């Protein structure tokens, strides 16, 4: 009889562990998505799916794509498309990198709110971030050595901005690399000569203002019309078509309820 009870207890324990694992969703990757948007999506999803838990690590798009390749997350957040080398690395491990566009974004160039400059051209942005121009007086400002803040190299925004705004040139040698959008906004907000870039969801941070680029401001309308030059899609990556809880969360994100949150946070809905 004791053996039967022991066997039953073990079976219930295993079932409980399996159930707990089934209700846990591991999401890794992009800070742009993972610092604000995905946690808010997760909270609403949990309200509709009691018992669900999330493990969200927002450490850069590269880490999210790597997590899908390594099998350490069900969803990888990315503000950029997976590189050919990453797709190949996934295939070598029997993984199929499946992208789902979940929101659109505009990369905003921000300066300190005390900076008198009213706007920049695409050429001036390239010159500033590559180090060709090092003083605000060269781009219509009142003078002062420009302090450039960028994301770190694991960030999708780091590589996207390099491609969209800098013709794939290298960043200025003295640029300071930050871990996330909020850190860039904080540093620029404290430095009258600072300049950096953030996703649209972060432009309302205190002490900063977003620059019109060739007259176009980053907004839902300009991103949808592609008139703002630094627009981009953002992604969830999964190993093939998502299933189970991952599928439910992806479907929620791209559905009406999720896209309402996308807009509220400051991103641009996909529809």
Model-derived features: where do they sit?
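Exported/periplasmic ABC-transporter solute-binding proteins
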Residues: 21-271
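Bacterial N-terminal signal peptides
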Residues: 7-16
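Bacterial N-terminal signal peptides that target proteins for export
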Residues: 1-7
């Amino acid at each position: 009889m004791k053996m039967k009870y022991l066997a039953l207890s073990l079976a219930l324990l295993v079932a409980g562990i399996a159930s707990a694992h089934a209700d846990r969703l591991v999401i890794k990757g992009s800070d742009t998505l993972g610092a604000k948007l995905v946690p808010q999506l997760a909270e609403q999803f949990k309200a509709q799916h009691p018992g669900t838990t999330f493990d969200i690590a927002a450490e850069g798009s590269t880490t999210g794509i790597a997590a899908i390749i390594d099998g350490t997350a069900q969803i990888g957040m990315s503000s950029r498309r997976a590189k050919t080398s990453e797709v190949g690395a996934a295939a070598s491990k029997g993984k199929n990198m499946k992208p789902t566009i979940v929101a659109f974004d505009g990369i905003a160039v921000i300066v300190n709110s005390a900076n008198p400059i009213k706007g920049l051209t695409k050429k001036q942005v390239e010159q500033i971030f590559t180090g060709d121009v090092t003083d605000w007086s060269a781009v219509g400002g009142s003078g002062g050595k420009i302090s450039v803040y960028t994301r770190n190299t694991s960030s999708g925004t780091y590589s996207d901005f390099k491609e969209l705004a800098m013709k794939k040139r290298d960043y200025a040698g003295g640029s300071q690399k930050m871990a996330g959008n909020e850190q860039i906004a904080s540093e620029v907000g404290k430095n009258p000569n600072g300049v950096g870039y953030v996703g649209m969801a972060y432009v309302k941070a205190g002490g900063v203002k977003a620059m019109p680029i060739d007259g176009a401001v980053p907004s839902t309308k300009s991103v949808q019309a592609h008139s703002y030059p630094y627009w981009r899609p953002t992604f969830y990556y999964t190993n093939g078509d998502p299933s189970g809880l991952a599928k439910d969360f992806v479907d929620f994100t791209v559905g009406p309820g999720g896209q309402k949150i996308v807009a509220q946070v400051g991103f641009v809905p996909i529809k």
